[in-house]
Structure formats: C-alpha cells, structure tokens
Swiss-Prot record:
SMART domains: CK_II_beta. The gene is CKB2. InterPro entries: Casein_kin_II_reg-sub_N, Casein_kinase_II_beta-like, Casein_kinase_II_reg-sub. Keywords: Cytoplasm, Nucleus, Phosphoprotein. This is Casein kinase II subunit beta-2. Heterotetramer of two catalytic alpha subunits and two regulatory beta subunits. Interacts with CCA1. Pfam families: CK_II_beta. Phosphorylated by alpha subunit. The keyword Transport does not apply. Belongs to the casein kinase 2 subunit beta family. GO terms for cellular component: cytosol; nucleus; protein kinase CK2 complex.
Length: 282
C-alpha cells in the first residue's frame, strides 16, 4: 500500500516536470533579450512576451496542483479501501445468532443467550421437529462440525434452513422467560415491531404474535394493545416469518409482566356518513 502511494506521487512529479520543461522549451529565445529603447523603457513586444511567460508559469503551477490533488485523492481512496477491508474483517467474527438477527426482515428477533441454548431442558422435544437437529444446533452455537466436508452443497443448504427453524422454535420459548421479555421490551420501546396502522390508535407500538404454535401454519402478525386487533407487518420480508417463532402467548404475557405499558382501550371509532348524515347501524 505504501509503495503504491509512493508510485502515485512520483508519477505526478514526473508529469509536472515534463510540463515545466515543455513550457521552457516552447518559450521564444528572444523573449528575454528584447532591446530597451533609449528612454530606458521596455518595448511593447517584451511586455507582451513577459505576460505570456507569467501566464505559462501560472498554468504550470495549476497543472502541478491538480496533479497533486489527484494523487491525494488516490491516497484517500486507498485509505477508504483499507477501512472497508478492516470493517469486513470485523464482520467475520460475528456470531451466527448476531448475523441471523441482523438480517433484513429479522428485526422482530432478539438474540437468545448461548447458555439458554446449551441447556438441554430448554430444547426438549425440538429434536423430533427439526431435521439435521445436531448439525443445526452446532451451526447456531458456532461449533465447527467434523463432518462438514462430507455434506453436499444441497445438504448444507438444508442444514442452514434447519438452523433457522431451530432458532425460531428456541426463540419462541426464550421470549417467555424474564431475560427474553426484557430483550423484547427494548425492541418494543424502539418501535422495532412497528406501529398500529389504525388511525385512532395514534401510532401505538405493536407486538409480534403468531396465530398458531405449530410451525408453517401461519406467518407472523403484529398485535396492537390499544385496539386489541392483529395486522400484517408492513415489510414484505417480515411478512414471510413463521408465526410459530413468536407463538400465541408472547404479547399477552408481555403486557401482564409490564402492566404499566398497557394502554387504555381506544374509545374513538370511525363513523360512517353519507352526505353528512350518520348511517344507521342495524
């Protein structure tokens, strides 16, 4: 990197020197030897040539400055590329759980503690629901498997899908614990789950909910504590998440645990009118 920077600087200096030499070579030989008249004044021809020389000097200076700026810009771009490479290398140390939760569309997920996942009691019954269970669990915990090279590319994709499913099922259990509720509380305060689209709820923050605890039965929805209704998430990426990864219990247990966050039920409702007259409700 340092050698490349040195080369850029030397090239610009060589170009500048060539330009200066060309300017000197192109100067007329008689410009500096114009005769002075008897009154001791420089002739008009010599004045014009002097101005031309001054203009040539200024152009050579501006050319050298522009070349220097170009070399500086190359140095800056090299520095930026170094910083981007450093940031990329830092990202390689990210755990699988952090990587998964930071994926686009996975904003509803919180990071499950490794200690919780390593406790077999918390994973009871999941081995029969998730294919490639052991390999998926190793992938979640960043444990290198000795059989990784034996799998085909298709099998590796299946293991990755199984890891996402297993993490989702673990996540549904974790968010019902005190630690999990606290993690979801932070996301709730940051409006990570979105706001209620209903006008009279005035932007009430929502909570994720599943309509079934069985995987692949339905996608995740958002529950509004104010109007007590469920809605589709606004993001199409979040709309593809399995609702079983959050379960049917979470939002209600959350509001029971943090009762002070439960808002008053919305009192206003939309009134239907035709030409200003309210419609009669049968």
């Amino acid at each position: 990197m340092y050698r490349e920077r040195g080369m850029v600087g030397s090239k610009s200096e060589v170009v500048d020197r060539k330009r200066i030499n060309e300017i000197h070579d192109n100067r007329p030989s008689h410009s500096m030897s114009q005769p002075v008249n008897g009154k001791g004044k420089v002739t008009s021809t010599s004045v014009l040539m002097g101005k031309q020389q001054l203009h040539d000097k200024e152009s050579s200076r501006s050319g050298s400055i522009s070349k220097t700026n170009i070399s500086d810009a190359v140095d800056i771009s090299d520095t930026d590329s170094e910083e981007s490479e450093v940031s990329g290398s830092d990202g390689e140390d990210t755990s699988w759980i952090s990587w998964f939760c930071n994926l686009r569309g996975n904003e509803f997920f919180c990071e499950v503690d490794d200690d919780y996942i390593q406790d077999d009691f918390n994973l009871c019954g999941l081995s029969h629901q998730v294919p490639y269970y052991d390999y998926a669990l190793d992938l979640i915990l960043d444990v290198e498997s000795s059989h990784g090279e034996m799998f085909t590319e298709e099998q590796n994709e299946l293991i990755e899908s199984a890891a996402e499913m297993l993490y989702g099922m673990i996540h549904a259990r974790f968010i019902l614990t005190s630690k999990g509720l606290a993690s979801m509380l932070d996301k709730y305060k940051n409006y990570d789950f979105g706001r209620c689209p209903r006008v009279y709820c005035c932007g009430q923050p929502c909570l994720p909910v599943g309509q079934s605890d069985i995987p692949r039965a339905s996608t995740v929805k958002i529950y509004c504590p104010k109007c007590e209704d469920v809605y589709y998430p606004r993001s199409k990426y979040q709309g593809n998440i399995d609702g079983a990864y959050f379960g049917t219990t979470f939002p209600h247990l959350f509001l029971m645990t943090y009762g002070h966050l439960k808002p008053q039920k919305a009192s206003q409702s939309y009134t239907q009118r035709v030409f200003g007259f309210k419609l009669h409700k049968p």
